[in-house]
Amino acid sequence: MATIFTKIINRELPGRFVYEDDDVVAFLTIEPMTQGHTLVVPCAEIDQWQNVDPAIFGRVIAVSQLIGKGVCRAFNAERAGVIIAGFEVPHLHIHVFPTHSLSNFSFANVDRNPSPESLDAAQDKIKAALTQLA
């Protein structure tokens, strides 16, 4: 059965995409730890990061680095946080989010009900930042 991320990638469910190529996509999470919290996901369904083909994992990491630069620029952040948790959705994904503090590295701090407007604004800011970086 397809994961929720595969359904988002295939446009069966909505997603706020900020990056996409043949192997990897990046879209905003619906439960951000900070504004601009983005998920970087391989298009292929791979459950655990340690089982992914090294070439695909390299692409996921390269896109995560690009998204990290984008979220830092978009939100004037000191750093980009990165987490590979491996729970909730059985499809490899890397959390990339703008941060100024180690205290942001907690899923207990997520916004469980962000406004659609704030997510749309974050998407626009990240896409603009990525365009500037290109």
Swiss-Prot record:
Q: Where is this motif: Histidine triad motif?
A: 91-95
InterPro entries tied to this protein: Histidine_triad_CS, Histidine_triad_HIT, HIT-like, HIT-like_sf
- Gene Ontology biological process terms from the UniProt entry: nucleotide metabolic process
Tell me which residues make up the HIT domain. Answer: 4-107
What GO MF terms are annotated? catalytic activity
Q: Which domain of life is it from?
A: Bacteria
Looking up PANTHER family in the UniProt record yields: ADENOSINE 5'-MONOPHOSPHORAMIDASE HNT1, HIT FAMILY PROTEIN 1
Q: What is this protein called?
A: Uncharacterized HIT-like protein ML2237
Give the organism, scientific name.
Mycobacterium leprae (strain TN)
Q: What is the lineage of its organism?
A: Bacteria, Bacillati, Actinomycetota, Actinomycetes, Mycobacteriales
